[in-house]
Amino acid sequence: MQPQTTKYDQNASTNLDQDVNSSRLVKYAQNQTEIKEYLYAILSKEHPRLFEKYGPDFLAIDLAELLKDGEILCKLGSLLPASKVPNNPSTKFRSSKMPFVQMENISFFLSTCELVGLPHDEIFQTVDLYEAKDPYQVVITLMSFSRLANKIDASKFPHVVGARAARVKPNVPSKPFRLRTK
């Protein structure tokens, strides 16, 4: 009888968690430019000076670093119409260099996402962005937000980022034979 192998005996150079994390980081790198272009297209109309502090090539800045203070997220969330999001938390934005205020700004945007009905499993946690724990989850949230915001107000949110949600055709059962007319 052979001894049972343990995790210490394996010859694999990576484990499943590392593979998943590296896969998500690759997807993050692939999608962050599209997200930044979306944010610029939506926000530059209402807030033309918002991106000036990042310089002319803000597309070269990492998305997580760009969103870390919560300002861009709150400005995005505050564009939602008040009729659809009464008492919008994103309007409570405060500009600050203090970490707890920046994390609070991020949480204002996340509260707005919950209020508009974004699925809970598509909403990132504050540490996913602020500490860059899972930056791809931030991308997922912004993609989902873009789809939902487009449904709410297509005039302010004309663009959608990422794949469109599939519309499932409802399954209509056929009429039983005994009820069909002859």
Model-derived features: where do they sit?
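Alpha-helical coiled-coil scaffolding segments
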Residues: 1-182
